[in-house]
Design a protein with these regions (language model features):
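Thiamine diphosphate
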Residues: 3-6, 104-128
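Glycine/aspartate-rich loop-and-adjacent alpha/beta segment that forms the canonical ThDP
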Residues: 14-102, 109, 121-124
């Protein structure tokens, strides 16, 4: 199975072309913000929200081809704090309002997990 993780905004063309050309099933997971995310800037800023999701490490972009056993990491190293991305969405910021101490711990854990995930993907791409 060909697998790719992309967003509506970034690198989707390459992922979809590879998926279409692959002989067999393909899975393309695409980040697409919706109104239920509670984007504080409003739905008119969805393009920026997708960019921030990638820049913060919340959503890493990659492609994997089973035919070549090649894993391609399309994301660059995160350039913004995950917390800065998460506080821009009501689905996350509401936790901070309701349970500030828990939120602080959970946001720190999420930041650590996002960094570890990116490093894991980076190592995998470099080991090719």
């Amino acid at each position: 199975n060909l697998v790719a993780k992309t967003s509506i905004r970034k690198r989707r063309e390459a992922a979809l072309k590879e998926a279409e050309a692959h002989k067999g099933p393909s899975i393309v997971i695409c980040y697409a913000p919706c109104i239920n995310h509670g984007i504080k800037k409003g739905m008119g800023c969805v393009q920026q929200e997708m960019k921030d999701a990638v820049a913060s490490g919340y959503w890493n972009l990659y492609r994997y081809s089973p035919e070549t056993h090649k894993f391609t990491l399309d994301s660059k190293e995160p350039s913004m704090a995950l917390y800065d991305f998460m506080k821009g969405e009501v689905r996350y910021s509401s936790l901070e309002l309701s349970f500030p101490e828990n939120a602080k711990v959970l946001f720190a854990e999420a930041e650590d997990a996002a960094k570890a995930k990116y490093e894991s993907y980076k190592r995998r791409a470099e080991d090719q």
